[in-house]
Amino acid sequence: MTRTGLPALALTALACGAPAGDEATRTAAGGAGGAATAPADRVALFGDMHIHTMYSHDAFMGTVRTTPDDAYRFARGEAIPHPSGESIRLSGAPLDFLAVTDHAEYLGALPALIDPDSPTYGHPLTEDLFSGEGGAARARLGALSRLRELAATGDPINGPEVRASAWQRIIEAAERHNDPGRFTALIGYEYTKGVGGRHVHRNVIFRGGEAPELPFSSLDGDPEDLWNWLDGLREAGIEALAMPHNMNQSDGLAFPDRETWKGAEIDAEFAAKRIRNEPVAEISQQKGTSEVHPSLSPNDEWADFQIVQYYLDRVNNTDPISIFKGGYWRDALLTGLEMEERLGVNPYALGAVGSSDSHVSAGSYEEDNRFSSRTNTPQARGSAYREEDGGWENFWTPRTATHGTGGLAGVWADTNTRAAIFDALTRRESFATSGTRIRVRFFGGFGLEDAIAGAADQVAAAYEHGVPMGGDLSASESRTLGAPASSPASGNAAAPSFLVWALRDPENAWLQRAQVVKGWLEDGEAKEQVYDVVCSDGLPDPETHRCDDNGAQVNLDDCSISRDKGAVELRTTWTDPDFDPGARSFYYVRVLENPTCRWSTWDALSLGIEPNPDLHATHQERAWSSPIWYTP
């Protein structure tokens, strides 16, 4: 997210001509206030559910010494120390909620080595990690390999006493900072399963203040074993969910369509277990966006956004990632339709969230205020060449330079509490952003356009006559409602209509367009199409379903942006012109801002040099809704 330097506008001013009591007024309350008395009174909350502190072994090896308490303080707007020695702080508004998600694997093992009260204080591995020689990256990685070997032998370095102590401290920090109605501190952790550098990671989030004595880690079993564990917790009265992330680095292992991790054939039971425990996926974070890949969706002009090209967990491996199918959210949504046709259950009916995956106890969401995980210089992160390079032609761009800023999770919740946020996630009334705070609403229904026309409160009418993002529509509803809308592709068959609504982040760029991304099955084959449904300056072309370029510009001399292009609000009702009542389908909204400078360009500007030619100078920040599904 890039700060434009403009004064923050009251959200009530954003909904041009919006009826009193509707969206604009409703979101002005932010995260404070009492519980919603009706679904239409739900508020948009922004948070991060992927933060690492010193209790994660990789963060600790990166000289991070900040704690969960620091993470919550940062989220609430306070300054905390960065490993570089600098002080870091949000330049915009505080977050509404946060989850510290330290790795369950070797949880707290490294801080315990230098804690005099720990049973592993003075362990032989300590010298390897903290001696002068151990300061080198290779030595630290060697020590990490040794840590894994020791853990496999039952060495107390990864014993239950060490892990339970760290876990308890994480829970206690969440309890200290949880402030219902004002700020929510969720209890969570990361399950970090890797197969040869390929990620099948998950974050686990708990609904309340109850949590098990120890988190379930990848050392305890594969993701299916994790779901069994979550099912067992639920039976014991402890509700939790998992959300996959970094799917873009999984080589297709994130979303298999035929074979489980145990080598068995995927069946309906497996599919049901997965979607029961994993209702949402993290599709935007600093290690890349996992919405879509250009090779999977070549007709999507906006697919090339924060695409990570290299594996992160293979030292000195510069081979690019080459397997994309099974590693991106839209592809999984399409695969889910095919699997539902075959199995009767869709394991990939996934909502969307974003988060940061920060390893310094603080998410970096702002393009002009970005900080790295360890060293915090432009030269180290590839946005500036070193003096000895003499220019870009002699500079090797590190693979991490393609990383972005952190994403954010948005939810429409009854109030700012653990239970309300968790419930929004389970019903998939959630959305993701690339770090900007665009508010997105999305409703679908048969006859919805007529039902909300002229309504005093369109949101209330949309809840009454349709479903919000994350919901399901069926052919039986179409027949019951007798909706009048029709589409050319289906003759007289009723087609669903959708309410698409987005409000600009008042401290970021103006909105350029809102799109509906549709996926469906046609003769058993998955298809997709992107429709521009509302433009900031003009109307979509009815033939191409595209908005004209609105002409918004970025001045690379100072990163200033066009002030006369774009919209503060985008709102429309849209009816699918190509609806086939016999085809399984899904729809989700993607909202694009006008172009702004990427973080690497801001870095170059601060040093008075040209931006790195190997990186995008500008990009379009965005938001994604969770889908609405249609079942024939």
Go through each PLM region and give its residues.
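Bacterial N-terminal signal peptides that target proteins for export
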Residues: 1-6
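Bacterial signal peptide processing site
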Residues: 17-20
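C-terminal functional module detector
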Residues: 24-68, 72, 82-122, 159, ...
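Enzymes and membrane/adaptor proteins characterized by extended Gly/Ser/Thr/Asp/Glu-rich
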Residues: 51-61, 125-128, 144-151, 199-214
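The substrate-binding groove and active-site-proximal loops of carbohydrate-active enzymes
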Residues: 57-62, 150-164, 207-220, 318-327
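Long, well-ordered early-domain segments
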Residues: 105, 138-184, 198
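Low-complexity, serine/threonine/proline-enriched polar segments
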Residues: 125-152, 541, 558-559
